[in-house]
């Protein structure tokens, strides 16, 4: 009789202890963003001129892990830029390059460029990812809106100069 009682109790205790801490290798980690950079296609410098193409690149200081899909949406605050993103959706674990967009602003001024990246989780989610970091001229906001994906929003101001 005691064996019948102790066996299920022992099995339950063993199951609870084994679930106490998940192994880190099964945790999906979000990319850590270093900065958003801007580079002219024409001069290959950071001097951005109205009417000329430039590339906005979100640089990752650390790649993500166990992310099966990434979706990228580029925009600007005034919706005045012409955007041509390199990719809008990738299998992140196979293609974890820095997201980039080719943009043209036709008028000089200061514009806020934004990337909203959605990283679909294929392992265990990490709730400690939620935070906001400052970058020069902008910020990076990390969110976990559901246990199925991370959302990373990167915004930065770019100064567009008048054509010479």
Positions of PLM-derived features:
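Low-complexity "stalk/linker" and mucin-like segments enriched in Ser/Thr/Pro/Ala/Gly
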Residues: 71-96
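Structural beta-strand segments of beta-rich domains
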Residues: 52-56
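Bacterial Sec-dependent N-terminal signal peptides
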Residues: 2, 13-40
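Short beta-strand segments of immunoglobulin-like
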Residues: 42-48
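Residue-level recognition of secondary-structure-to-loop junctions
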Residues: 95, 103-107
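Acidic, Ser/Thr
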Residues: 58-63
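Short acidic/polar inter-strand loop motif in beta-rich domains
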Residues: 119-126
